[in-house]
């Protein structure tokens, strides 16, 4: 499911897709977001990442419709080959303040947190910290709608453009990738730089990712990765 953002030629993805992978283990904090019970073939899914034991970072358009029924949101951490590393239901949705707007300004606000019904216990799934972008090449780890039970894709994404609160990237995305973390790796492990939110038609920029704003970062306990290097 997609929606157009006018002249910017942007398609907001409600969910995941793609191909390409490395042998290195994918962090279990990256998970699949679905709705209701077991998702039917072709049903809407999104991607997300655990940033605290009870908080999942994702795209706002993935969870805005479920804000009044957060228990319908299901997060499967470490989903691989049909097997979750851990499953939780939503308890609340934290959305940006204000009414959503169209265009690039609205795209920059397309990020949210899902509060889980119960935290993952220590050692079960390690949350990913956030960091500011450094360099121009990042890693996207995301699920895809047409293969929801498969391990997530991993692609390299080069930054080709910037806009306020946004990174324009050279990697193509498909339905299901929305909400996926754009990651950087340092000596301590993976860190979240941005959240994938849209595909772009025409020109070298193929997708857009949101840099989590300060107001949202303040909702994440610092000990759980609310700030980064």
Each PLM stretch: what is its role?
Residues 30-53, 179:
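A conserved glycine-rich beta-strand in the N-terminal activation segment of trypsin-fold
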Residues 1-10:
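Bacterial N-terminal signal peptides that target proteins for export
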Residues 108-111, 115-173, 177, 205-209, ...:
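Chymotrypsin/trypsin-fold serine protease catalytic domain
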Residues 22-28, 35-40, 64, 70-120:
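Conserved catalytic-core segment of clan PA serine endopeptidases
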Residues 54, 58:
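Cytochrome P450 catalytic-core helices
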């Amino acid at each position: 499911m997609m929606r157009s953002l006018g002249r910017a030629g942007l398609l907001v993805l409600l969910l995941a897709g793609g191909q390409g992978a490395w042998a290195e283990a994918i962090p279990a904090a990256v998970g699949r977001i679905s709705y209701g019970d077991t998702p039917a073939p072709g049903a809407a899914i999104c991607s997300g990442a655990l940033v605290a034991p009870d908080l999942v970072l994702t795209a706002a358009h993935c969870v805005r419709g479920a804000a009044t029924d957060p228990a319908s949101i299901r997060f499967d951490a470490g989903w691989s080959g049909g097997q979750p590393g851990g499953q939780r239901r939503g308890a609340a949705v934290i959305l940006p303040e204000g009414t959503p707007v169209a265009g690039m300004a609205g795209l920059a606000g397309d990020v949210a947190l899902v509060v889980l019904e119960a935290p993952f216990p220590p050692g079960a799934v390690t949350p990913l910290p956030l960091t500011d972008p450094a360099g121009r090449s990042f890693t996207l780890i995301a699920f895809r709608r047409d293969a929801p039970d498969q391990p997530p894709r991993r692609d390299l994404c080069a930054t080709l453009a910037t806009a306020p609160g946004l990174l324009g990237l050279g990697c193509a995305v498909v339905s299901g990738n929305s909400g996926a973390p754009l990651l950087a790796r340092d000596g301590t492990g993976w860190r979240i730089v941005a959240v994938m939110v849209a595909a772009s038609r025409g020109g070298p920029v193929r997708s857009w990712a949101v840099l989590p704003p300060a107001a949202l970062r303040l909702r994440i306990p610092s000990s759980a990765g609310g700030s980064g290097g």
